[in-house]
């Protein structure tokens, strides 16, 4: 779990969050539209839509934006988005998984390939690196819901697999297939979660030096800046000394 926490800290470094937030609402809206189009436009009858709305609210997305994204799914002229996963290698032999929602597979594939190549990486085939990750459910709560013991007890009762607590919150991990069931069970003891989502968690992390870490961060930043890219995951780790420099 340490790798998850470290990667999160690096990606949340100063100055980067403003750049990410500028595109966050459009990415969240796209997920809401896709979720609404895949099932009923009612979050009570559509688990994926309910989670998408929940995650959007956690990022302070205005209600008008959320409603507009749902209505867009019902429009006859609305775009059809495909869910695509790309897998590749970054500097130092690190593994990277990219999740995208796109209305043009050729455009997105070309953009992602170009980003990998310019950063000294290489785009691989589907399945080339995902075997070294676990696809799991992640449910997050703010620290205000209770201490680590309370959250651990609630997580065990709900059928979760693990809990990590740091200075920013509680992170509960469960099987991907049980995400909806576990998140619903947690609500009785902890209330509504801040975020509920599926993530790719590295089984083992690859140590890299400061130079390679900086190259990797530029690669990941470029991927996240692409309008079609929803999520990026990697398996690199750095020393505490390098982490302090990168997070500054």
UniProtKB/Swiss-Prot annotation:
Entry's family note: Belongs to the TACO1 family.
Subcellular localization: Cytoplasm
Broad class of the protein's primary localization: cytoplasm
Matches recorded under InterPro entries: Integrase-like_N, TACO1_YebC-like_2nd/3rd_dom, TACO1_YebC_N, Transcrip_reg_TACO1-like, Transcrip_reg_TACO1-like_dom3, YebC-like
Organism for this UniProt entry: Rhizobium leguminosarum bv. trifolii (strain WSM2304)
Database matches in HAMAP family: Transcrip_reg_TACO1 (MF_00693)
GO-annotated cellular components: cytosol
Lineage of the organism: Bacteria, Pseudomonadati, Pseudomonadota, Alphaproteobacteria, Hyphomicrobiales
GO molecular function: DNA binding
Protein name from the UniProt record: Probable transcriptional regulatory protein Rleg2_3214
GO biological process: one example: regulation of DNA-templated transcription
PANTHER family membership: TRANSCRIPTIONAL REGULATORY PROTEIN YEBC-RELATED, TRANSLATIONAL ACTIVATOR OF CYTOCHROME C OXIDASE 1
Keywords: Cytoplasm, DNA-binding, Transcription, Transcription regulation
Keyword Membrane annotated: no
Gene3D superfamilies membership: 1.10.10.200, 3.30.70.980
């Amino acid at each position: 779990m340490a790798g998850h926490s470290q990667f999160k800290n690096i990606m949340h470094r100063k100055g980067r969050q403003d750049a990410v937030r500028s595109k966050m609402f459009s990415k969240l809206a796209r997920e809401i539209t896709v979720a609404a189009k895949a099932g009923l436009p009612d979050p009570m009858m559509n688990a994926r839509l309910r989670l998408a709305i929940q995650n959007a609210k956690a990022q302070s997305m205005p209600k008008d934006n959320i409603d507009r994204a749902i209505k867009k799914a019902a429009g006859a002229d609305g775009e059809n988005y495909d869910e695509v996963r790309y897998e590749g290698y970054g500097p130092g032999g690190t593994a990277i998984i990219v999740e995208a929602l796109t209305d043009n597979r050729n455009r997105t594939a070309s953009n992602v390939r170009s980003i990998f190549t310019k950063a000294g990486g290489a785009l691989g085939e589907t399945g080339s690196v995902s075997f070294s990750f676990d696809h799991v459910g992640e449910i997050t709560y703010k620290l205000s819901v209770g201490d680590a013991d309370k959250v651990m007890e609630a997580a065990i009762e709900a059928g979760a697999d693990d809990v990590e607590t740091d200075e920013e919150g509680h992170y509960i991990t469960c099987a991907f297939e049980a995400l909806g069931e576990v998140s619903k069970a947690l609500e009785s003891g902890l209330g509504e979660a801040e975020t509920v989502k599926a993530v790719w968690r590295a089984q083992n992390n690859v140590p890299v030096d400061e130079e390679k870490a900086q190259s990797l961060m530029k690669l990941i930043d470029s991927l996240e800046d692409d309008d079609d890219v929803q999520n990026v995951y990697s398996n690199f780790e750095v020393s505490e000394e390098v982490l302090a420099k990168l997070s500054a």
